[in-house]
């Protein structure tokens, strides 16, 4: 392999790949508009040593089917992962552009038609449904999971293991649903800062509910207040640390009778009954003082800071279930799938390894931080988005903390009867209704968990039986 030199300044020009779409979505697609500056990035001997002992894939091209191009366009930089893949491994990626509407049809057509396609973004439908459709190969023969670079990710990787094989090997986790709030508003209302509660291990459902009730009760005559808005249902249910569908490595089973899940659903009932939840869709933290907590992945934070210049915004992980030892969070795993019949298993595995290195090596993480803290401005110089260093640094601790556990539920990957996001109760998937039906209250949705569970439990049992027959 070529051994090239790099300069520190150029390393800091690299952009780190964004890992996933917002929680509740279906994929770990890359961020839009990947581009390269005029300066190429070269790598020193230490960097080129990352492929020691790996198969020689120099000259190979991976055909990647996706919505966004992994290669640079316009005038931005290559990602760290792509730079390593091209400069160390000597391989290339050719993107086959698709759309969100045709992505899965395009994948099936290319597989069935024998057209080249090697790599595909992990989608929540990938396992078990995509595997059972014959769309993917497992990665066991290509990735050495005993390599220390996978330390800290092993537990999550094991959760995705299906039929004894590793079809999904997440290289990073992102987009945890977090609670954004105004520290100024918290102080004005005489409430305890959620960050202080989190640091003391006291940020749980009880503290969350109590502060919202106080905030709403403090409303003046004629003032409308809500405790929370945003993406809450799934975050509440998954904060129990339990999934709707369990898998023991051989059989699936329904967990809809779980007492912990019932408590989460009863909490949603209470939020609705007390009118604490505002179902209005907000793209940023509301700046009118009407909402205390905004639940959303942090993609909004830069713009929310601009929209709330005097708010002193901060954020904390979603509160834990009372008595829980950890924070179980709704987030997205970034992973790439090896497509069925591909002869580029070694190359796809190498790219996955590059993504993992990009997410974990300190110099690349520092490069990502420097880019993240750059203000976004219009041509006229108006700031449209920014993060504070305090916000950024605290968010990074979530991905290394032993007290935070990312959640995964096979239920999202069991076909359209189980997962189908629509705005109609009768056509939504079971998972969608179970996660936030009691909050969203689309027409026809029962008002209680007991009724909702009873209406859909039979479908869960049927789907579980269907997939167990394939084991």
Cite the ranges covered by each PLM segment.
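Bacterial N-terminal signal peptides that target proteins for export
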Residues: 1-8
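Extracytoplasmic/periplasmic solute-binding protein
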Residues: 120, 161-173, 177-179, 187, ...
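Short, solvent-exposed loop/beta-turn-alpha elements that line the ligand-binding surface or hinge
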Residues: 140-152, 197-200, 220, 242-262, ...
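Glycine-centered hinge/linker elements that transmit conformational signals in sensory
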Residues: 212, 247-280
């Amino acid at each position: 392999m070529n051994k090239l030199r790099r300069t520190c300044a150029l390393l800091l020009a690299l952009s780190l790949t964004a890992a996933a779409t917002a929680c509740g979505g279906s994929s770990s697609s890359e961020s839009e508009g990947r581009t390269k500056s005029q300066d190429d990035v070269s790598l020193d001997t230490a960097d080129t040593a990352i492929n020691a002992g790996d198969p020689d894939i120099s000259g190979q091209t991976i055909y990647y089917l996706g919505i966004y191009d992994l290669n640079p366009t316009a005038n931005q930089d290559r990602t760290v992962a792509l730079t390593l893949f091209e400069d160390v491994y000597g391989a290339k990626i050719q993107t086959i552009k698709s759309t969100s509407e045709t992505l899965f049809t395009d994948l099936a057509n290319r597989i069935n038609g024998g057209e080249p396609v090697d790599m595909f973004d992990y989608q929540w439908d990938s396992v078990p449904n995509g595997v059972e459709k014959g769309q993917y190969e497992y990665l066991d023969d290509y990735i050495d999971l005993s390599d220390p670079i996978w330390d800290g990710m092993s537990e999550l990787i094991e959760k995705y293991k299906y039929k004894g094989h590793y079809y999904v090997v997440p290289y990073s986790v992102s987009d945890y649903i977090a609670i954004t709030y105004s520290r100024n508003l918290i102080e004005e209302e005489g409430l305890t800062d959620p960050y202080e509660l989190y640091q003391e291990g006291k940020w749980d459902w009880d503290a969350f509910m109590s502060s919202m009730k106080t905030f709403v009760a403090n409303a003046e005559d004629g003032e409308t207040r809500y405790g929370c808005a945003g993406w809450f249902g799934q975050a509440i249910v998954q904060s129990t640390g339990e999934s709707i569908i369990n898998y023991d490595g051989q059989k699936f089973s329904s967990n809809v009778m779980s007492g912990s899940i019932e408590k989460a659903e009863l909490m949603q009932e209470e939020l609705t009954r007390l009118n604490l939840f505002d179902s209005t869709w907000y793209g940023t933290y509301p700046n009118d003082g009407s909402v205390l907590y905004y639940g959303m992945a942090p993609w909004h934070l830069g713009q929310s800071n601009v929209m709330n210049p005097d708010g002193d915004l901060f954020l904390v992980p979603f509160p834990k279930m009372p008595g829980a030892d950890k924070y179980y969070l709704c987030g997205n795993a970034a992973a790439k799938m090896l497509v069925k019949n591909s002869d580029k298993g070694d190359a796809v595995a190498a790219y996955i390894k590059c993504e993992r290195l990009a997410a974990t090596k300190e110099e690349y993480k520092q490069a990502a931080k420097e880019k993240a803290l750059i203000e976004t401005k219009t041509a006229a110089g108006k700031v449209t988005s920014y993060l504070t260093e305090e916000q950024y640094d605290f968010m990074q601790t979530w991905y290394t903390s032993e007290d935070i556990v990312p959640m995964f539920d096979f239920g999202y990957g069991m076909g359209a009867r189980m997962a189908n996001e629509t705005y109609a109760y009768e056509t939504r998937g079971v998972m969608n209704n179970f996660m936030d039906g009691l909050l969203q209250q689309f027409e026809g949705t029962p008002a209680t968990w007991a009724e909702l569970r009873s209406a859909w439990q039979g479908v869960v049992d049927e789907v579980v039986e269907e997939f167990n027959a394939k084991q």
